[in-house]
Regions:
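Glycine-rich phosphate/pyrophosphate-handling loop used in enzymes and phosphotransfer proteins
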Residues: 1-204, 209-244
Length: 244
């Protein structure tokens, strides 16, 4: 019940003021940060420890490439994420995907410094696509919202039509990595009217789980002639051996 009142308070503040003066996580009053209170900032699982150089996941020790990438090297050039997919971030991303579009600003605010520091050579931003039916059902593509905000902030052009989702695919959550790859095979392609040849692309998404979706999308972009495809997400699932 306490959580319900906090959520109602957050929504009321936004409706009246048009600004975030309450923490998007707990509803407490904000002072030093634009989106999160001090307590939540201290508890959020930022992806700031050891990470895999390739997929950017949180790993248990300081080694260059995680075992999963060694076993199945992804097609993207590299990937990074602002948070580890655990704790309150899991709840917030679920809310983001089920109507709470305002969270795009808070997430993009944490992705922006990574974009500037890690992907300085980016020529173009893109996002993981959804089918028109899926966008209609949800009302928006959450990855497009993130990419749009990041493009406005950094000035890197956003190519909204770079990738096309050609068909509906089965829910990915319960599938193994091999099943995900089979499920997504041929489901993402580069739009024939877009040009990515010779460009460095940053692909935006909300969550990286196994990385299969990002890898399939990157493969299509690289086949179309892009120089590189880096991936930037709100959060990524940590290395399997870690208990975060």
């Amino acid at each position: 019940m306490k959580g319900l009142f906090a959520e109602m308070a957050k929504r009321a503040v936004r409706l009246v003021s048009g600004e975030n003066i309450a923490c998007v996580c707990c509803g407490a009053e904000l002072f030093s940060d634009k989106y999160f209170c001090e307590r939540c900032l201290d508890s959020l699982p930022f992806n700031a420890g050891y990470i895999c150089d390739k997929c950017g996941r949180a790993i248990a020790d300081d080694y260059p490439v995680c075992p999963e990438c060694k076993a199945h090297m992804p097609d993207y050039t590299s990937a990074r994420s602002a948070f580890v997919y655990s704790g309150e971030i899991v709840r917030l991303i679920k809310e983001f995907k089920t109507g709470e579009k305002y969270l795009a600003e808070a997430f993009a605010d944490r992705m922006f410094p990574i974009l500037l520091s890690q992907f300085r050579d980016a020529d173009m931003l893109a996002f993981v696509p959804m089918t028109p039916r899926a966008v209609k059902d949800r009302g928006y593509n959450q990855s497009e919202l993130l990419a749009d905000i990041l493009s406005q902030r950094c000035g890197i052009p956003l190519e909204r039509e770079l990738l096309v989702k050609t068909r509906e695919t089965a829910e990915q959550k319960e599938l193994s990595a091999a099943e995900r790859a089979k499920n997504l095979q041929g489901s993402i392609r580069v739009h024939e009217r877009t040009v990515c040849r010779g460009k460095n692309i940053v692909l935006i998404d909300d969550v990286m789980t196994t990385g299969t979706t990002a890898s399939v999308a990157a493969k299509a972009i690289l086949r179309a002639g892009a120089l590189s495809v880096h991936v930037l997400t709100v959060a990524s699932v940590p290395e399997r051996s870690q208990n975060i």
